[in-house]
Amino acid sequence: MSAKKRPSGNAAFELPKRRRTYQACISCRSRKVKCDLGPVDNPHDPPCARCKRELKKCIFSSNKGTSNDLPPNSINAISLPSLGKSKQEIQNDSTSPILSDVPLSRKGISSEKSFKSEGMKWKLELSSMQNALEFLAQAAGTVAKEGAKEIIKEKSTTPKPLKSSLDATNKSATDEGLKRLSKSDSTNTLYENTADMLNHTLNTNRKTSQLMEEIGKVRPPPTRKIDDFDYIGPDSLLTKEEAIELIEAFFLTMHPFFPNIPLQLHDPKELAEYPILFCAILTVSARYHPFDTLGLDNGEDGMRHIEVHDKLWVYCQKLISQTIWAEASTRSIGTVLAFIIFTEWNPRSIHYKWSDYANDPELNNVNARGSKNISTRKDEEGLTGVGAIRRSDRMSWMLTGSAVRLAQDMGFIENSSKVFIVTHISETTSAMNMNQRSLLAESFSVLNLNLGKIENDGNESNEDYLGNEKFYLNEILPDEESKLRWKRVFENSENDHDNEKNFLTDWEREFLNDEYVLYYSNKKDDTNLAQNHIPPFPLRFSFAQRAKIEIIRILSIAYETIYCEKNKRKLATTDQRHNLSVLSVFSPLIEGWLSNYRELLVPLSDVPFSLADRKNKKQIFDNIDRINGESIITDFNYCQLYIFSLALQVDGKTSRLNMNEIVTSARYVELAYRSAKEILSSAKRVSRQGMLKYMPVRWVIRIIRSIAFIVKCYLTLTGSELATNPDARNILKLSAISVDETFDIIRDTAVTLKEATPDELHLCQRYAAILMYLCTEMKLRKKSYLERPPLLRDGTTPLESNRESSLEGQDLTKKPIFSKRIGYNKTETTFEPSERPLTEEINSNSQNSNDTSSKGIVDPFVEQNNDITTALLNNELFQGPSLSDEVTDWFGASEDIGLEFVEPWTELIEQRYMQCGDGDNNNFENLYNLFVNSNNINNDINNSRPITRK
């Protein structure tokens, strides 16, 4: 029982045996197991039994208590030599430098609060993976710093032989712990130590942040010069002067079709900061601009520009391949625009099956690849027109997808109005061509364009008028470099600026937005998230930009509801009544667009164009405005053609349509036909200015689809009654479509495409040949049609020519009919007396036509071309077999809706063209010369009717 007696007074300093005298190690605590350090009254040196058995490092955290928790006499007693080996020396020996475990005195509470307030600077909100990584990086920097101190401390400590006595082993650690826990140091000294550790931790965090900034500065943003590129120099592929000439020519001739490159980058020196965009512009410009037209040396054979184009394209491929690794230097707006440029203007290699690493073992050798002769590829069999288009669509789909992903990552879509427009137009167009779901389709549903015009009441603080521009003016223009760029862009441009009312023009708004995106939003850290750079106000789009977005929005909706099959959402069927219901939904959308943006439909005026004006900034701005008007006209009319062409999809196997349904269908078909004509008329206006050869691929495809729809109407009208659908024939007869006019349109389009060909591989060259071949094949059908009685072939009297058809006995006077109102150089199409479902259409070529109800609206030069057509048909070059039944009866058997027939039917015509051997260049040139001679009269007629610009 004596063992259970309380200790005597001499041993009052001893601790109760029930109280734990040591902590468990971190490993044992994490597994919630007993940490065995021997007897409680005589613990041994770490590691514990479990860590020693598992060969783990035995680590202890510091004591959670404070120094004031122990009575002074206990501290003094612990320091007595009689105790020698206490638990405290073990705790102090294993104390971690982690700040949160350091005991604080009562006088150190304010220091703790100070740390909590200052330490929040690096406690990031873990809202994303990137924030989490930044947090871990800072924490790792702090721990690494402390770990390095421990390593240095361990290396500086002289190792001592291990003794069985605990006192000899931990004497130095005990002495250090006693110093920290002595009464004299429990207040001031402890506070100073804590403050030192606080300052050390905060300084460590600051150093970590500075270190991350320094890492970002290891490779600073390069300041490139034009001479720095490997392919530019006196003995290189291009000289500096030649590169500048090509860039200036691009912005004069090609950029107006694609006005989405920031104004600051029109300067070659600024453009050189973006290597991939710089090279992309040089590549496409070299193909479309022979050097001799720029006053440069084009080689002895006159093909040096083609050689430069091919070699620059190989160089561009290397740059493009490097962008997939998400290198910081490639994550720029220049990369986004470079990808889109190659979708608008394809390289020549799109027409060839180029060797790559998968089918050419020599390309595995880097040296062999660099020295491979590009000219040998010209001898390979090239892709046909349709094959080249398919490859172009695939390339556009992939490049546009990469551009959209990068723009989303960097926040360009939210920050830049130009990037927003170009990504939505290119991505939606490529998705439609590939029959895929658009990546940006959802953004149309949440987009608010603020369709009302921007009006300024004279108050400069009006945020509805200024928006982000006020932010830009306050934050950007005070910078001297920004002022200098402003001066360079707008000097000698004669920009219309109203100084009295302080109006901002569209050009100035675009400049400020571009300046923010290029030089401010990502200038410090290109790894920041996109949401960190969103300007304080929503994007402000110009009037023309909003018009383009609205058109592509309607097209996107039409594609998903009419044509899209991937998600089983196609609403169009062979049931014409159902199709008419679908079209009735889109009619108000198109008419609403026209009522809002009618003033933008300004045809191109006959202003002289010359490459010598490429250094004239005013001429460049004027060119952009003029071509932009034609672009909007083309976009609007293609939207109508894309949607209303569905009205000609009639299934003859189902029940016949009644009169009202035929008239309604004819109304839509006529709008589609006139839209196709207006697209071709727009192309002719641009061609008269010598600008059509610079048009992007998107324009070429729309021209081809327009002429294909016209050919479909022609073949349906002139086809045999047994092969064609009678309802479709009746619809076309009511649509006031002239057969004579249709044949002339096909011929003129073939000549226009041939003249717009920049080289022998361009798509225009291929389709011009196909259309000329089609004209030769259509001659017998044309002759047989002309031999019919006039009432049976004249498209201007469709009702009288069909007295014996199913329309007989119908009272047509009670049905809605067409009327036209001509004014302000615009032709307004309405439906009277009660309906007005569609559009007031812009057609400058039909200004002199007469008001009709039963007559078709025919251009005045059509009748004068009858003699020309007869001469063409009697020419010996037109002698040969007529169109086969497979070609003419295609539309009766095909179930393609809308414009889906264009690609397979065009491929069929192209195959027949190749099989018949009419691809011979001599025969092609002879046909072209014949067509040109007959077309000169048309040009004289058109020139006698000049188009005035508002």
UniProtKB/Swiss-Prot annotation:
DNA-binding region, residue intervals: 25-58
UniProt-annotated stretches for the region Disordered: 154-177, 791-810, 830-857
UniProt keywords, alphabetically: Branched-chain amino acid catabolism, DNA-binding, Metal-binding, Nucleus, Phenylalanine catabolism, Transcription, Transcription regulation, Tryptophan catabolism, Tyrosine catabolism, Zinc
Biological processes, Gene Ontology terms: aromatic amino acid family catabolic process; branched-chain amino acid catabolic process; L-phenylalanine catabolic process; L-tryptophan catabolic process; positive regulation of transcription by RNA polymerase II; tyrosine catabolic process
Source organism superkingdom: Eukaryota
GO cellular component assignments: nucleus
Keyword ATP-binding among UniProt keywords: no
GO MF annotations, alphabetized: DNA-binding transcription factor activity, RNA polymerase II-specific; sequence-specific DNA binding; zinc ion binding
Biased composition (Low complexity): 843-854
UniProt-annotated location(s): Nucleus
Keyword Lipid metabolism: no
SMART domains the record matches: GAL4 (SM00066)
Signal sequence annotation: none
Amino acid composition bias (Basic and acidic residues), ranges on this chain: 801-810
Protein task: Transcription activator required for the expression of genes involved in the catabolism of aromatic amino acids such as the aromatic aminotransferase II ARO9 and the phenylpyruvate decarboxylase ARO10.
Further information: Present with 319 molecules/cell in log phase SD medium.
Protein name, per record: Transcriptional activator ARO80
